[in-house]
């Protein structure tokens, strides 16, 4: 058995009163002769850990020791030594790891951001192998439905994909998450992970065209979403020439600029384009001039300087950055 942490406090029998523990002498915690600020542990916690130290130092690989680790984890799920000893017990006793996985899921229900739990679950999944894939993906999906930015869940999910498989439906899953919340930067990050790492999609170059179309549509719907703009830029990683020459990127910027609202990232993207060999055409110049007149800033013959000046006004949080960008322009030097 994997042990049960779901014991009602009123029903718990102290270890010292349990017949099966009568032969064990608990080992108290040694804080030294004169502890300055000793921790005021509860009586239950102190007793469980005293007995745990006894079986741990005795290297007792027994069923009762396994049950004791469950109690200790129920009191402190972050104790690395307890989890480590539990793994030794599981292997020695040849415990059914499907049962252990259920135990971990119960513990995680109230401690989902505890690193030790995820480390242990990964160990269990690794032991079970590919058969654990679906349950692990479903487990992370359950966690992410409550907390879409849960770091440990995303990290575990990526580990499962890379080690146990399951790539086939992952891009669709990312699309589902983005359909629910287009601002979910974790879903954008996972989408990029999938198109660049999946062995079934062909890599970034093979996916670029369709992903650009997907991202352009997302940006048009919510141009104020920084995540989608960053994703678009990431689709041209190490391909800056392709990026600045892609007609879809420039036409997207122009379309957003003409709306005169939520154009911050379109404008910063245009600055990146204009800083390259590409010079904005008349349509872009007209759109920038309209924005300049809208916010009443000084006219400049160089469009890149004008863009920086506009960004200084519409993006005050990063005003120092835009001032620096302007100072780096050849025309401002």
Swiss-Prot record:
Cited PROSITE patterns: PFTA
Main function: Essential subunit of both the farnesyltransferase and the geranylgeranyltransferase complex. Contributes to the transfer of a farnesyl or geranylgeranyl moiety from farnesyl or geranylgeranyl diphosphate to a cysteine at the fourth position from the C-terminus of several proteins having the C-terminal sequence Cys-aliphatic-aliphatic-X.
Cellular component annotations (GO), alphabetically ordered: CAAX-protein geranylgeranyltransferase complex; protein farnesyltransferase complex
Protein name: Protein farnesyltransferase/geranylgeranyltransferase type-1 subunit alpha
InterPro entries per UniProt: Prenyl_trans_a
Enzyme superclass (EC): transferase
Cofactor(s) the protein needs: Mg(2+)
EC numbers, comma separated: 2.5.1.58, 2.5.1.59
Lineage of the species this protein comes from: Eukaryota, Viridiplantae, Streptophyta, Embryophyta, Tracheophyta
Superkingdom per UniProt: Eukaryota
One Pfam family linked to the record: PPTA
Complex formation: Heterodimer of FTA and FTB (farnesyltransferase). Heterodimer of an alpha and a beta subunit.
Keywords assigned by UniProt, alphabetized: Magnesium, Prenyltransferase, Repeat, Transferase
SUPFAM superfamilies, per the entry: Protein prenylyltransferase (SSF48439)
Molecular function terms, GO-annotated: CAAX-protein geranylgeranyltransferase activity; protein farnesyltransferase activity; protein geranylgeranyltransferase activity
Catalytic reaction list: L-cysteinyl-[protein] + (2E,6E)-farnesyl diphosphate = S-(2E,6E)-farnesyl-L-cysteinyl-[protein] + diphosphate; geranylgeranyl diphosphate + L-cysteinyl-[protein] = S-geranylgeranyl-L-cysteinyl-[protein] + diphosphate
GO BP field: protein farnesylation; protein geranylgeranylation
PFTA repeat residue numbers: 61-95, 96-130, 132-166, 167-200, 207-241
Family: Belongs to the protein prenyltransferase subunit alpha family.
Keyword Magnesium among UniProt keywords: yes
């Amino acid at each position: 058995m994997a042990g049960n942490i779901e014991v009602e406090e009123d029903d718990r029998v102290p270890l010292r009163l349990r017949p099966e523990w009568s032969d064990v002498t608990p080992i108290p915690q040694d804080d030294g002769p004169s502890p300055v600020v000793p921790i005021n542990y509860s009586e239950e916690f102190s007793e469980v850990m005293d007995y745990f130290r006894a079986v741990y130092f005795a290297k007792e690989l027994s069923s009762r020791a396994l049950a004791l680790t469950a109690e200790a984890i129920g009191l402190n799920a972050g104790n690395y030594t307890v989890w480590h000893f539990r793994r030794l017990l599981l292997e020695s006793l040849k415990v059914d790891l499907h049962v252990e996985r259920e135990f971990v899921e119960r513990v995680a229900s109230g401690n989902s951001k505890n690193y030790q739990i995820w480390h242990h679950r990964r160990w269990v999944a690794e032991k079970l192998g590919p058969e654990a894939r679906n349950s692990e993906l479903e487990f992370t999906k359950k966690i992410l439905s409550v907390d879409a930015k849960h770091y440990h869940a995303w990290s575990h999910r990526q580990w499962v994909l890379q080690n146990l498989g399951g790539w086939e439906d992952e891009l669709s899953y990312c699309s589902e998450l983005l359909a629910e919340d287009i601002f979910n930067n974790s879903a954008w990050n996972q989408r990029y992970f999938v198109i660049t790492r999946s062995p079934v999609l062909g890599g970034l170059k093979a996916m670029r065209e369709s992903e650009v179309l997907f991202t352009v549509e997302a940006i048009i719907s919510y141009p104020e979403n920084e995540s989608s703009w960053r994703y678009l830029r990431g689709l041209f990683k190490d391909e800056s020439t392709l990026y600045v020459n892609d007609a879809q990127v420039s036409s997207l910027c122009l379309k957003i600029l003409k709306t005169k609202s939520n154009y911050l990232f379109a404008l910063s993207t245009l600055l990146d384009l204009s800083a390259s060999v590409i010079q904005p055409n008349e349509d872009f110049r007209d759109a920038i001039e309209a924005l300049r007149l809208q916010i009443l800033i000084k006219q400049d013959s160089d469009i890149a300087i004008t863009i920086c000046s506009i960004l200084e006004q519409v993006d005050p949080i990063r005003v120092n950055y835009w001032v620096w960008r302007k100072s780096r322009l050849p025309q401002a030097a």
